Regions:
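A short, conserved, highly charged catalytic patch centered on acidic carboxylates
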Residues: 1-145, 152-214
Length: 214
């Protein structure tokens, strides 16, 4: 039965309830904007499906759990970080020899519109899997910034070199540069002082393990 989960609406709750995705990282306003644009359609078997007009692709997309998170993160990029839709690409092709994979969200460089600047991963609900995926994408494209989120937890990375991803506190807003937000390597004291564990919903155990894995 539906019990309001945070700021989730019934429609979004129903889509996410059997998944590993949550909406804690997103504002009430963003969730309300997404919900206002949801259209229900009935399939041949009478089952109802939710669709929404994609903020970037400008066409109707079925709202599966990972698509809910993607649309909410796009809203965040537009309304909180100030990135124009013109700099965003979805399902961006990343080449590994003959193999082609698709990055969920890519923000292109402001001055070089063909160069990836930020890559966002929402389809891997676990941090370790998402980070590995992002490492491969950034190494292939040269993108310096990566973000992983499942809607409950979020992590930001700066690709220092192919073998080292440094945690950063956030990604730059459209008006900022990477150097404006880049920080020294995290310490446990940093984490406590900045309350990052609570904000990002990542456990101390996971964060320490992540630091040790680098």
């Amino acid at each position: 039965s539906y019990e309001k989960a945070g700021d989730q609406t019934r429609e979004i709750y129903d889509i996410l309830k059997d998944s590993s995705y949550k909406t804690e990282q997103f504002s009430k306003e963003a969730i309300e904007r997404l919900n206002a644009n949801i259209v229900e359609k009935e399939g041949k078997n009478g089952k109802k499906f939710c669709f929404v007009k994609c903020l970037v692709r400008q066409k109707e997309i079925q709202l599966k759990p990972e698509e809910v998170i993607r649309q909410l993160f796009l809203d965040k990029l537009i309304n909180e970080y100030g990135y124009p839709i013109s700099r965003m690409q979805l399902e961006y092709p990343v080449y590994f020899g003959r193999e082609v994979k698709r990055a969920d969200i890519v923000i292109m460089d402001e001055d070089r519109s063909f160069v990836p600047y930020v890559i966002v991963e929402v389809k891997k609900p676990k941090l370790k899997d998402g980070k590995e995926q992002l490492k491969s994408y950034c190494n292939s494209t040269g993108a310096p910034i990566a973000v992983w989120t499942n809607g409950e937890q979020i992590a930001y990375f700066n690709r220092k070199d192919p073998n080292y991803f440094e945690d950063i506190r956030d990604i730059p807003k459209a008006s900022q540069t990477l150097m404006d937000v880049i920080s020294e390597r995290w310490t446990i004291e940093d984490l406590k002082a900045n309350d990052v564990l609570q904000k990002d919903k990542i456990s101390l155990k996971d964060k320490i393990k992540d630091l040790e894995d680098e």
